[in-house]
C-alpha cells in the first residue's frame, strides 16, 4: 500500500486471520470453560435444575449463557453452593456466581476445595476470598493444573511479590499460573540477566524486576529466544544499552512481545515521516516508545488525524507522545481546548498529552485560570496619601 503521508514510502501490511474453533464437549473432570448451547427441557438434569432453583438461580440466564451444563448427568450444584456458603456467601451472592459462571456446577467439590486452599494462600480472610470469587468466578472455577498453580504462587511469593499483587495475577492473568513453573523461573532469570547486561545495577535489579512484573505479568510467557532476538535487533539499530534498558522499562516489558520485522517497519516509517537522522530517530523513540510499539499503519492513521486538525509534522515531532492517543481521543481533547479559546494549531501539543485523569485535571486548571479575575476586587488598594 502507498503511504498517504507526504511520502511515497511503501510498507507491507500483514493481516492475521483466525479460524473459529469448533465447540467441544466438556466433562465434569475437565477445566471449566465457556460453551454456549440451547436448553432442551426434555434432556435437562431435573435434579440440577431443582437444586439451582432452590438457590434462587435464574435458570433462563443459564440456558442463554451456557445451557450445556443443565444437560450433564453428573453435577455438583448443591456441593458448590455449600462451599460458597461456608466462605460466607449469602444466597444472593451464590445465585449471582452460579448465574455468571454456570460451569462451576460441573467442577468436582474436591477440585474446588483445592482451589479454595490455593487462593487462601494469598487472601487474608474468607470475606476477601468470597469477594474475589464474586468478582472473578471464571478464574476461580478454572480448576486445571492446580499443583502447578500452587508451585507458581509459592515461586512468586519467594520472589518477593506481595500477596495483593499475586491475587491480581490470579484473577486477571491466570494463564501465567498454568505455565510450567520451571518456564517462569527461566524467564525471570533471563530478565534479570538482560537487565544486568544492559548496565542495570545489581542493587536495584530485584526492585526493577518486581515493578516490571507488577506492570506486565504476561512477560513471563515470552520466550528467551524472543528476548535475545529483540535485544540483538535494537543494538544492531544503534541503540545503546542504556537506551534499550529505558525502552524495556518504559514499555513495561511489552518490548519482548514485538517482532523485529514489525519494529523495523515502524522505525523506517518514523524516520521517513519526520525526515530525521539515525541519531535523532533514536532520541525520538526513547522519548516516545509508542513509535516502536505501534505498527506503521496505526502511526500513519494517528498522524493523518493530527494533520487534519491543522497540526504540523514539526509540532508532532516536538511532542511525539501525542501519538499514544487514538484519533477519537485527539478530536475530543482538541474540541475541549477549543471551547476555552485555546488554539492548538498555534501552541504546543503537550496540553493534549497524558491519561484521561491527567488531561481533565489540566483542563480544569486552564478553565479556572481563564475565569479568574485580573485583580482581587475585595483586596484593599494601597494608595499613597
UniProtKB/Swiss-Prot annotation:
One of its GO terms (cellular component) is mitochondrial matrix. Keywords: Mitochondrion, Mitochondrion nucleoid, Transcription, Transcription regulation, Transit peptide. It comes from the Eukaryota. Signal peptide: none annotated. Monomer. PANTHER family: TRANSCRIPTION TERMINATION FACTOR 2, MITOCHONDRIAL, TRANSCRIPTION TERMINATION FACTOR, MITOCHONDRIAL. This is Transcription termination factor 2, mitochondrial. It comes from Rattus norvegicus (Rat).
Amino acid at each position: 500500500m502507498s503511504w498517504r503521508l507526504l511520502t511515497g514510502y511503501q510498507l507491507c501490511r500483514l493481516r492475521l486471520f483466525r479460524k473459529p474453533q469448533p465447540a467441544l464437549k466438556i466433562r465434569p473432570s475437565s477445566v471449566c470453560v465457556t460453551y454456549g448451547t440451547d436448553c432442551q427441557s426434555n434432556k435437562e438434569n431435573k435434579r440440577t435444575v431443582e437444586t439451582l432453583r432452590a438457590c434462587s438461580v435464574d435458570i433462563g440466564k443459564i440456558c442463554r449463557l451456557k445451557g450445556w451444563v443443565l444437560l450433564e448427568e453428573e453435577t455438583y450444584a448443591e456441593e458448590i453452593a455449600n462451599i460458597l456458603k461456608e466462605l460466607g456467601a449469602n444466597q444472593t451472592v451464590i445465585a449471582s456466581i452460579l448465574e455468571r459462571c454456570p460451569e462451576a456446577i460441573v467442577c468436582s467439590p474436591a477440585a474446588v476445595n483445592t482451589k479454595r486452599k490455593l487462593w487462601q494462600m494469598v487472601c487474608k480472610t474468607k470475606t476477601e476470598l468470597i469477594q474475589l470469587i464474586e468478582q472473578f468466578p471464571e478464574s476461580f472455577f478454572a480448576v486445571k493444573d492446580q499443583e502447578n498453580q500452587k508451585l507458581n504462587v509459592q515461586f512468586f511469593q519467594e520472589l518477593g511479590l506481595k500477596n495483593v499483587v499475586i491475587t491480581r495475577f490470579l484473577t486477571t492473568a491466570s494463564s501465567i499460573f498454568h505455565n510450567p513453573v520451571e518456564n517462569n523461573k527461566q524467564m525471570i532469570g533471563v530478565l534479570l540477566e538482560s537487565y544486568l547486561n544492559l548496565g542495570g545495577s545489581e542493587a536495584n535489579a530485584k526492585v526493577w524486576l518486581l515493578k516490571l512484573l507488577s506492570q506486565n505479568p504476561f512477560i513471563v510467557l515470552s520466550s528467551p529466544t524472543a528476548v535475545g532476538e529483540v535485544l540483538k535487533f535494537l543494538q544492531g539499530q544503534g541503540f545503546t544499552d542504556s537506551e534499550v534498558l529505558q525502552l524495556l522499562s518504559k514499555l513495561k516489558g511489552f518490548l519482548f512481545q514485538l517482532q523485529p520485522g514489525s519494529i523495523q517497519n515502524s522505525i523506517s516509517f518514523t524516520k521517513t515521516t519526520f525526515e530525521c537522522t539515525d541519531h535523532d530517530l533514536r532520541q525520538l523513540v526513547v522519548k516516545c516508545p509508542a513509535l516502536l510499539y505501534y505498527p506503521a499503519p496505526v502511526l500513519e492513521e494517528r498522524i493523518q488525524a493530527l494533520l487534519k486538525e491543522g497540526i504540523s509534522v514539526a509540532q508532532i515531532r516536538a511532542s511525539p507522545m501525542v501519538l499514544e492517543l487514538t484519533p477519537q481521543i485527539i478530536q475530543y481533547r482538541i474540541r475541549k481546548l477549543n471551547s476555552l479559546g485555546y488554539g492548538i494549531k498555534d501552541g504546543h501539543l503537550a496540553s493534549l498529552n497524558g491519561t484521561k485523569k491527567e488531561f481533565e485535571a489540566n483542563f480544569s486548571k486552564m478553565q479556572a485560570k481563564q475565569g479568574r479575575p485580573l485583580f482581587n476586587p475585595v483586596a484593599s488598594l494601597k494608595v499613597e496619601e
